[in-house]
Amino acid sequence: VQMEVPFGVIFAYFMLKEKPTIRALIGIAIAFVGVYILTGSPNLDGKFIGIGLTILGSAVWALGQVMVKPLSKEIDPLALVAWLALFSGPILVMLSAIIDGNTINYLTNAKFDHWIIAIYIGFIMQPITYGCFYYVLKNNPLYKVLPIVTMGIPPTGLLAAIFLLGEKPTPELFIGGAIIIVGVILI
């Protein structure tokens, strides 16, 4: 939903004392208006849990990036990615076992191409992208870095939903999405 950026700016202000510009604050307000439109305002019937979890996920990711920023100044970016993976991997496997159940069955029955994709994401894509992100993050305020890093997510997700899942976008999606992107650009 691109709400990682406004949440990141807000958290960085309180936790890192990074003062956003007036333009960034206006951008945050505009982005929240876009989310209101995108989510089907004023009718949230049957959507509240999904929307709430999506926004919560954005906030948690942004909080994580704010917490990582001070570490990125002290630890090499690739080492930081490795340490985060070392601790988050087992936690995610445990959560999968609790929520999905039968995680061992999924792992033992995974096909060869699934393992290739997992290895590519875990050992090539993730270290390179997050390593570069943490390198840039250590020397720049969050409000300058997050919009650039996350700008490709909404169009990619929308196109994937349309072409891979056959979803039909609504006018609210386009209007709200455009407003969110304008807000993020201002940030």
Question: What is each of the regions a protein language model found here?
Answer:
Residues 1-3, 68-90, 126-162:
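Helix-helix packing/entry segments at the starts of transmembrane helices
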Residues 3, 23-26, 49, 56, ...:
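Hydrophobic core positions of alpha-helical segments in small-molecule transporters
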Residues 11, 20-40, 58, 172-187:
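Hydrophobic transmembrane alpha-helices of multi-pass small-molecule transport proteins
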